[in-house]
């Protein structure tokens, strides 16, 4: 695929979710109020910084898969090993966040009326982190194979879901 086509898919992968996320965040902010929206954005930051538990493996997968193109056994080995390593490190993140969710809520000085919901939300966040980190490894496979069209279609969908699902959840709750 040409550089222009790959650039188009990369741009689309970031632009489409952004177009949906900006108004969705405005609505969520109005519905939640200042403190709850602050907690909500903190969770997005935690997901963003969760890449620390990736240990740089996703970047290594991109390079290794690109080098091993055509060697199916080598690619399977790379994906298997990286999946196991990231699953183990993300399990550590899950245990830390789930184990200290009430401590985190107290440390953040969250108002008493939001503490129970916030502790539950931290538990849900903890369970989703392994999925986020594993998807990063598997997206890296597509990037290493230079399958930018499929990669960015998936990124676009996941970005849209990250904007729309919280909006639906807040609207229903």
Predicted segments, located by residue:
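Residue-level recognition of membrane-helix boundary sites in multi-pass small-molecule transporters
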Residues: 36-39, 81, 120, 150
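Hydrophobic transmembrane helix module of multi-pass membrane transport proteins
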Residues: 16, 85-173
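N-terminal membrane topogenesis motif
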Residues: 1-21, 73-84, 115-119, 146
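Residues at alpha-helix boundaries and short interhelical turns
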Residues: 31, 36, 69-72, 90, ...
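Signature of the first transmembrane helix
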Residues: 2-63, 90, 94-98, 128, ...
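Transmembrane-helix boundary and interhelical linker motifs in polytopic inner-membrane proteins
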Residues: 1, 32, 50-85, 105-110, ...
